[in-house]
Amino acid sequence: CFNDAHQISFTGFGSPQWHNHRSNNDGLSIKGWQAVKNYMGDKSPYRYNPTYGFGPNGERMSASHNEYHKPQLSLNHQWQINEKSSLSTAAYVSIGRGYGNAGQGYKKDANGTTYRNMWYGSYKGNLKTYFRNSDGTFAYDQINDMNEASDNGSMMAMSKSINEHNWYGLLSTYTTKFGDYIDFYGGIDFLYYKGTHTN
């Protein structure tokens, strides 16, 4: 606060998030959900994720994974020009960074099944047994071993779809009174946006 007429403030907020989720292709039938009860112990079988598992180093993994962080910073100026008029201005920036995982595979196994489809944990409402551990988790270590043993490159791979955006803006609002019954509001709103989306 410079004086009674001018106030300046700076704000910033943001919360990184990540989550694993089930693919649209990983839905189970009622019979399929009941079949995974033994994997969930005393928890609801409907929390089961057919592609949840652990990587070669014990890290948690899912064929469908998302991470994103979009903090916003704002510099605000409030000017009380006189008893009737004021000007409120905010300059802000928002930088978004994140990605989503997706399983890839372009070859077929001996049975003619494409490796890309093996990333889906279920088929027609039933749980798949491809790369399935005895505890119901998806066996990412087995996929890694298969890729290492291949003479023709990786049979199955995880790709990242990267989403980046930059927002820059200026918002200013002028307010004044004309007499006792008329309020006037006017302002400007400038915005620059650039987004980059890559795989």
Language-model segments: residues:
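Feature captures outer-membrane beta-barrel proteins of Gram-negative bacteria and organelles
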Residues: C1-N3
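Structural signature of Gram-negative outer-membrane beta-barrels, strongest in the C-terminal barrel
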Residues: A5, H165, D183, D189-L191
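Acidic/polar loop-and-plug regions of large Gram-negative outer-membrane beta-barrel proteins
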Residues: A5-S74, N101-A157
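Transmembrane beta-strands of outer-membrane beta-barrel proteins
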Residues: I8-G12, L87-A91, F184-I188
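Transmembrane beta-strands of outer-membrane beta-barrel pores
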Residues: G14-W18, V93-R97, F190-T196
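Outer-membrane beta-barrel transmembrane strands
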Residues: N57-A102, S154-D183, T196-H197
